[in-house]
Curated annotation (Swiss-Prot):
Residues 255-275 have a biased composition (Basic residues). This is Large ribosomal subunit protein uL2c. Signal peptide: none annotated. Its main location: plastid. Residues 36-56, 224-275 are annotated as: Disordered. It comes from Gracilaria tenuistipitata var. liui (Red alga). Keywords: Chloroplast, Plastid, Ribonucleoprotein, Ribosomal protein. InterPro entries: NA-bd_OB-fold, Rib_uL2_dom2, Ribosomal_uL2, Ribosomal_uL2_bac/org-type, Ribosomal_uL2_C, Ribosomal_uL2_CS, Ribosomal_uL2_dom3, Ribosomal_uL2_RNA-bd_dom. Belongs to the universal ribosomal protein uL2 family. It is found in: Plastid, Chloroplast. It comes from the Eukaryota.
Length: 275
């Protein structure tokens, strides 16, 4: 993926960058693999905001992605590489030899016309999916399951990959993109390679309106709100927050307070915390 830099024709184009989309080969998605995506704008079923700073954004169709890769020992051909508005990674359309079509996350260096396969007997080639126990040490993997047969849940963002560090007993040790080192059961499937579109993190948004297209609303500081809206609010002019330490809109300690639940079951599988 290459990045295109705009000239400063307007303040909105100054320093603005976009993807050139050179790897995209098909502009229209497969009709059998799309569905409507009702956007809730951060509201729950009662209309109350439960996730702040989320707006409507541009209308999108949801592409059904195969995170399970459960068509074992059936070869599939990569037909096209497409844009997905719901994620920063690209997606690849597969045509299986039995006639079924599925989308998967597009791994880096996987080209059109190549074949991929899933299963214990799969070779160690980019795009193939197999259990962690059958993947050698040092291999880069993505779309990793946390529980067997549940489907890939971690390492799915553009440009990310995890590395297999060790194998012992019923578990495989993985180093994640966050530098966290954790144990995962050896029966869990993972896909060989790194997720494509590695320059996604280098994109410069350029203007506020582009963030609104992406369903992101402005994040207003609590100190400039009214007292009824935030504990930091109120006062005359530029006044301090009036508290010994920052707090959330609901009065709980913020900035430096760890938010992960202590009695979480998965703590036993984390060997080194993320940094």
């Amino acid at each position: 993926m290459a990045i295109r830099l705009y000239k400063a024709y307007t303040p909105g184009t100054r320093n603005r960058t976009i993807s050139t989309f050179n790897e995209i080969t098909n502009k229209k998605p497969e009709k059998t693999l799309i569905r409507k995506n009702h956007r809730r704008q951060g509201r729950n079923s009662r209309g109350i905001i439960t996730s702040r700073h989320r707006g409507k954004g541009h209308k999108r169709l949801y592409r059904t992605i195969d995170f399970k890769r459960n068509k074992y020992d059936i070869k599939a051909k990569v037909v096209s590489i497409e844009y997905d508005p719901n994620r920063n990674a690209r997606i690849a359309l597969l045509h299986y030899s039995d006639g079924e079509k599925r989308y998967i996350l597009h791994p880096r260096s996987l080209n059109i016309g190549e074949t991929v396969i899933s299963g214990i007997k799969a070779s160690l080639e980019v795009g193939n999916s197999l259990p962690l126990n059958y993947i050698p040490l040092g291999t880069a993997v993505h779309n990793i399951e946390l529980n067997p047969l549940k489907g890939g849940q971690i390492v799915r963002a553009a440009g990310t990959y995890a590395q297999i560090v060790a194998k012992e007993g019923a578990f495989v040790t993985l180093k994640l993109p966050s530098n966290e080192v954790r144990l995962i059961r050896k029966e869990c499937f993972a896909t060989i390679g790194q997720v494509g579109n590695i320059d996604a993190s280098n994109i410069n948004i350029g203007k506020a309106g582009r963030n609104r297209w992406l369903s992101k609303r402005p994040k207003v500081r609590g100190v400039v709100m009214n007292p009824i809206d935030h504990p930091h609010g109120g006062g005359e002019g530029r006044s301090p927050i009036g508290k010994p330490h920052p707090v959330t809109p609901w009065g709980k300690p913020a900035l430096g307070r760890k938010t992960r639940k202590k009695p979480k079951y998965s703590n036993r599988y984390i060997l080194r915390k993320r940094k």
